[in-house]
Curated annotation (Swiss-Prot):
UniProt similarity note: Belongs to the GET4 family.
Lineage: Eukaryota, Fungi, Dikarya, Ascomycota, Taphrinomycotina
GO BP term, pick one: vesicle-mediated transport
One Pfam family named in its UniProt record: GET4
Organism encoding this protein: Schizosaccharomyces pombe (strain 972 / ATCC 24843)
Keyword Isomerase carried by entry: no
Cellular localisation: Cytoplasm
One GO cellular component term noted in the UniProt record for this chain: cytosol
InterPro entries, A to Z: GET4, TPR-like_helical_dom_sf
Main location: cytoplasm
Protein name per its UniProtKB record: Golgi to ER traffic protein 4
Length: 303
């Protein structure tokens, strides 16, 4: 098999178009013969080679074909199988239009690990959307991602904030906090906020006092009260302390953009029912949270 792979690589470098057609024909035969491992090895090697020589359209075609074989042969989301798929994901440039199709197929295949998909795959997809400067598209994948996701989400929101600092920092810091609280993941809510806050205080030198609550240190901002609200919201949600929460919302008036999310959070953690039952409220508010903030674009400048 190694000899076939080397011949295919050589042909691709010599004549990308003919090599691509030849490799596809060979893979078709292997799939019909149920030699799925051999087919995957050829497709993976061929896609990598084509990405290297900047034949991204043909590379994307082979990468998507590899996922087709994964599904046809019921490949599990094992470490090796994920490694191949995520390596190819990382080679897609932003300008390659087929990247979204690859992401869609990758997420569908990863559902072999569970109905929401594989956490490592979601984290990798989120990371690539950030690389492609589409942070809003990354958010739901950070929420569904692995243990690295929360801090990466907080960092992404900070860099998004720096691209449009006319918007208050709590607008960006609040996005992961509210999304993780809706997902009932308080640790990730805290980690994302802690990461955002560290970047913000280091680069902007705001007027703050340091405080400790339940063994957690956090800054109290004099200029940005809603940043304080976010920290205290996580603490009260952890304790499920309804009275303290009601005091908080008296002291810190709700931001209009947060009202729908907070209505659901109130119900989840404090047993406060919404005044009127709204159909599909969770789907609606998650959709609004994963869209771009007011007056901001879905673009991220990390240069």
């Amino acid at each position: 098999m190694d000899a076939k792979i080397k011949r295919a690589e050589g042909r691709l470098r010599e004549d990308p178009y003919e090599g691509h057609q030849m490799l596809r024909t060979l893979v078709n035969r292997q799939v019909k013969a149920k030699k799925h491992d051999d087919a995957v090895a050829l497709l993976y090697s061929g896609a990598k080679t084509l990405f290297e020589i900047e034949q991204t359209g043909s590379a994307a075609d082979l990468a998507i074909y590899m996922l087709d074989v994964y599904e046809k042969a019921s490949y599990a989301a094992s470490l090796d199988n994920k490694a191949r798929a995520l390596t190819l994901l990382g080679l897609f440039p932003a300008e390659e239009g087929a990247r979204k199709q690859y992401v869609k197929r990758l997420l569908e295949w990863s559902k072999s690990a569970g109905p929401q998909g594989d956490k490592d795959v979601h984290f990798a997809v989120a990371t690539m959307f950030v690389k492609w400067k589409e942070p809003a598209s990354a958010e739901k994948h950070f929420v569904l991602g692995n243990e690295k996701s929360a801090r990466a989400y907080g960092e992404t929101m900070y860099y998004w904030f720096t691209s449009d600092s006319s918007i208050s920092p709590d607008t960006f810091a609040g996005r992961p906090v509210l999304n993780y609280l809706l997902a009932e993941n308080l640790i990730s809510a805290w980690n994302s906020l802690e990461t955002f806050t560290k970047h913000f205080t280091k680069s902007n030198a705001p007027d703050v006092e340091n405080m400790s609550f339940d063994g957690k240190d956090f800054p109290v901002f004099k200029e940005y009260p809603q940043m304080n609200f976010l920290h205290l919201l996580i603490f009260t949600a952890y304790r499920k302390d309804k009275e303290t929460y009601l005091s908080l919302v008296q002291k810190y008036p709700k931001k209009q953009d947060w009202e729908a999310a907070l209505a659901k959070i109130e119900e989840i953690y404090f047993g406060i029912r919404p005044v009127s039952n709204q159909p599909n409220i969770l789907a609606n508010l998650m959709s609004s949270l994963f869209s771009g903030p007011p007056a901001a674009t879905n673009q991220l400048d990390l240069e």
